[in-house]
Amino acid sequence: MKIDDIKDLKIEYRDKLDINPKTTIGMEIEFQNAKLKQVNKKLKRNLDTNWIAKYDATVCRSILGIMHGGEINSPILRNSEKTWEDLQIVCNILTKNKAEITEKCGGHIHIGKQLLNEDSYMNFIKLWYIYEPIIYRFSYGEFNRERESIFSYAASVRNIFRVLIMHEYNYKNSFDIVQYLSSRRKLGVNFQNIYSKETIEFRCPNSSLDPVIWQNNVNFFAHLLDKANNVEIDEEKIQYLLRCHTDKHKNVADYTKIDLNNANELANIVFDNEIDKLYFLRQYIKNGEEKRSIDFTKSKKFTK
């Protein structure tokens, strides 16, 4: 598939996703500029579920004594029509209250750990190790590059995963792997919540006010975990990457480069549905721009 084949495709919002029915979901929507108290008031008035806006030091600031910005935490969600209707309402509330997504704002997604079998953690780690540059570029959503805060709050895990893979014989079960990974939280994928909240947290996505982006992100990460249970890992590719690995591979700033071959490869591993594949690739390529811009700017709109 070429960029020209999908550059005019628009990603549509769906009533429900075709994901494992065991999937549980959590979202953390960081935003700036909207009045925090006002957003919370609107959430309580318009929703019968427990979406809460709270203070977050990364994005909040006081203007004339009024707190602006914050983070909206969802309740534990399922893949239902109501979940996606509620997400639309939340995004509309933020938009109407003049919220903005800046390069300080992350859009973290929690997926219940039950999707990943106990003996599949190393499979997941290998998949992420191979395709991290693809995953990061996809997770930038409608923005052309990573947010500024990603280096501090959602750093690359490629070097950490490399050590695990090289010493795989020492990490035979999920407990050993989680013990090794749980010392740090502020990574692109965070295992620290595995036992306390029973979730795997994906911290690399930029935040968004577009529910289509959120839904597409959830769809990818849920499928990624689910597919790690039965994927056949390309061990030759792993060994090649281990041999060629240098410090530049941990530089997230280089992940704006488009690698359509690897993106296609990942889409074919993760998705069985052609629409899912196309929507993943469309968000990955954005407007086809590879040069990392100085400004944190949006791509030409590719959602309906």
Listing of model-derived features with the role each one plays in the protein:
Residues 195-200, 204-233:
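Long, repeat-rich segments with strong aromatic
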Residues 1-97:
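Terminal catalytic/cofactor-binding subdomain
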Residues 24-28, 119-208:
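Aromatic/basic-lined ligand-recognition segments
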Residues 46-52, 94-101, 132-135, 222-232:
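A common structural junction motif
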Residues 80-90, 114-140, 210-225, 289, ...:
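Helical (often loop-to-helix) elements that flank the catalytic cores of nucleotide-handling enzymes
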Residues 100, 133-148, 227-283, 288-290:
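Flexible helix-coil linker/hinge segments at domain or subdomain boundaries
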Residues 283-304:
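Acidic, glycine-enriched catalytic cores built around paired aspartates
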Residues 100-116, 199-203:
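Histidine-centered divalent-metal-coordination microenvironment in nucleic-acid enzymes
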